[in-house]
From Swiss-Prot:
RH2 domain sequence ranges: 291-356
Processing after translation: S-nitrosylation is required for the interaction with GAPDH.
Keywords of the record: Cell projection, Cilium, Coiled coil, Cytoplasm, Cytoskeleton, Phosphoprotein, Protein transport, S-nitrosylation, Transport
RH1 domain span: 10-97
GO molecular function: dynein light intermediate chain binding; protein dimerization activity; small GTPase binding
Tissue: Widely expressed. Expressed at lower level in liver and kidney.
Transport found in the keyword field: yes
Protein name (Swiss-Prot/TrEMBL): RILP-like protein 1
Disulfide-bond pairs as recorded: none
Organism in which the protein naturally occurs: Homo sapiens (Human)
Keyword Secreted: no
């Protein structure tokens, strides 16, 4: 009773929560509260009153469960996607800047080559003129006037200044080219660092997705286990109540029969009750096809072991997919953005909400079976009135086992 009150309070608090704060546990609490209300309606009006309504309510609760689970996972994925898009845009901008810089360097190099070619042609022309002058000078007389000597000296000085200017221009352009090369190397290092950062963020994103899927699988397994245990507990309590009611009716009937027989039969009445209880225990242990063959703790252990195995299998599958993706990346050797993983279409397993409502319908079937057993017990009471004895005969024990 305390557990039922606690679950009812949890469901009411879940109904009062804000829509953005709902969790999967709140959805299951709401489903439990709706199931209890359905059970009350079935007890009062029968199963036909909600036969068409129950599947629709179950479907609505399943849709709510899926939406709540997506709402909790979506913000983290959106942040990671925005970060990845931002890094891609930065990378594209840097690549574009690098291309522009390369084009500028090519233009500067072309200009420098053109100027150097012009200067070389001028030097060749001056050297040719110098040779011609030297040959002319050798053929003429050695007697030069002072004016001619000064003129020749002025021409050589002008050529020397031109050569000096050309050398300065060439050195300056060489320094500029070296500076541009250093700047280009730094830009390439920045691009490589950004690519490494992008690959690291992609791996972190993949690990986070893997962890989110594992946590979702574990949460769903725990929720399903809780629902199954609650349903088993409810069925056990209802079975205990029905068995107690049957035992009370049998005892009242036997006490009424023995009170009519006088003083001798009340002395044997406790023995009869003990034999009834023993016979009922034997019948429950041997003839009941639905008798418990294991304890509740064993059932919990089996469910826990099954959930652990499921989570391990899921982890191994994710690791295998991760290693396969790494091998593909190593084969390609080109950092590419990861493809958007589409969820694989697989048959949807039965949700905990359907399982919960199936337990409620199963309880109604058990109540119908208990009513049938009460009818059989009344027929057995008539048979016992006709075959009274000091103790139960073998036929009476067989009838109890049948019950």
């Amino acid at each position: 009773m305390e557990e039922e009150r606690g679950s009812a309070l949890a469901a009411e608090s879940a109904l009062e929560k804000n829509v953005a704060e709902l969790t999967v546990m709140d959805v299951y609490d709401i489903a439990s509260l709706v199931g209890h209300e359905f059970e009350r309606v079935i007890d009062q009006h029968g199963c036909e009153a909600i036969a068409r309504l129950m599947p629709k309510v179950v479907r609505v609760l399943e849709i709510l469960e899926v939406l709540v689970s997506r709402h909790h996972v979506a913000p983290e994925l959106d942040e990671l996607r925005l970060e990845l898009d931002r890094l891609r845009l930065e990378r594209m901008d840097r690549i574009e800047k690098e291309r522009k810089h390369q084009k500028e360097l090519e233009l500067v190099e072309d200009v420098w080559r053109g100027e150097a070619q012009d200067l070389l042609s001028q030097i060749a022309q001056l050297q040719e003129e110098n040779k011609q002058l030297m040959t002319n000078l050798s053929h003429k007389d050695v007697n030069f006037s002072e004016e001619e000597f000064q003129k020749h000296e002025g021409m050589s000085e002008r050529e020397r200044q031109v050569m000096k200017k050309l050398k300065e221009v060439v050195d300056k352009q060489r320094d500029e080219i070296r500076a541009k090369d250093r700047e280009l190397g730094l830009k390439n290092e920045d691009v490589e660092a950004l690519q490494q950062q992008q690959t690291r963020l992609m791996k972190i994103n993949h690990d986070l997705r893997h962890r989110v899927t594992v946590v979702e699988a574990q949460g769903k397994a725990l929720i399903e286990q809780k629902v199954e245990l609650e349903a088993d507990l409810q069925t056990k309590e209802q079975e205990m109540g029905s068995l107690r009611a049957e035992l009370g009716k049998l005892r009242e009937r036997l006490q009424g029969e023995h009170s009519q027989n006088g003083e001798e039969e009340p002395e044997t009445e406790p023995v009869g009750e003990e034999s009834i209880s023993d016979a009922e225990k034997v019948a429950m242990d041997l003839k009941d096809p639905n008798r418990p063959r294991f304890t509740l703790q064993e059932l919990r252990d089996v469910l826990h072991e099954r959930n652990e195995l499921k989570s391990k299998v899921f982890l191994l599958q994710e690791e295998l997919a991760y290693y396969k993706s790494e091998e593909m990346e190593e084969e390609n050797r080109i950092p590419q953005p990861p493809p958007i993983a589409h969820p694989r279409t697989s048959p949807q397993p039965e949700s905990g909400i359907k399982r919960l409502f199936s337990f409620f319908s199963r309880d109604k079937k058990r109540l119908a079976n208990t009513q049938r057993n009460v009818h059989i017990q009344e027929s057995f009471g008539q048979w016992a009135n006709t075959h009274r004895d000091d103790g139960y005969t073998e036929q009476g024990q067989e009838a109890l086992q049948h019950l």
